[in-house]
């Protein structure tokens, strides 16, 4: 008896786990991979007997006197000014109408068919109509503002910079993550080392969180399971 109960419990547990897997909705992050990059260490300088050494290790932060501070190497930082304001609106309507009418009868009927078709017994009249009206509309709005400092993780062959960055903010028992990646044209970088997000190509902005507040906003796995199975 106990053995059968154990088998029943095991089967029930497997069934519940299977239902959980069917109802689970995978979440793929927009910004994948590492969210930071370290500068590549340069070769050790070779002493040439001069007081000024033109070849300095990259870790020393050497920079020519007349060169600006704009990022151009892997590991350089850049501030992204988030200025996303996107809105979309769509509406559509359709009207269709159709009417039809048909009459059929015998004006003259032979005498031997009078009993069957006479006195308008064979007259047929049919009419029909069909009307369709449809309307639809959709509105969407998205606003995102703020600043985020990112790191150059790749220098493309045409001189553009691929940047990636992340900011984590812990609030009570939850953590907010802001991730960003995209391709920046160095010509769009201002003198203050900033660039608006509207001028970043292939921009990917992700704002997610974890904790009990984020979990409260998600539908339970059992509800999602019945929602997927419900025909309504």
From Swiss-Prot:
Keywords: Bacterial flagellum, Cell outer membrane, Lipoprotein, Membrane, Palmitate, Signal. A lipid is attached at residue 22 (S-diacylglycerol cysteine). One of its GO terms (biological process) is bacterial-type flagellum-dependent cell motility. A lipid is attached at residue 22 (N-palmitoyl cysteine). It holds the Pfam family FlgH. Residues 1-21 form the signal peptide. It is found in: Cell outer membrane; Bacterial flagellum basal body. One of its GO terms (molecular function) is cytoskeletal motor activity. InterPro entries: Flag_Lring. One of its GO terms (cellular component) is bacterial-type flagellum basal body, distal rod, L ring. It is a lipid-anchor. PANTHER family: FLAGELLAR L-RING PROTEIN (PTHR34933:SF3). Belongs to the FlgH family. Assembles around the rod to form the L-ring and probably protects the motor/basal body from shearing forces during rotation. The basal body constitutes a major portion of the flagellar organelle and consists of four rings (L,P,S, and M) mounted on a central rod. NCBIfam families: PRK00249.1-1. This is Flagellar L-ring protein. The lineage of its organism: Bacteria, Pseudomonadati, Pseudomonadota, Gammaproteobacteria, Enterobacterales.
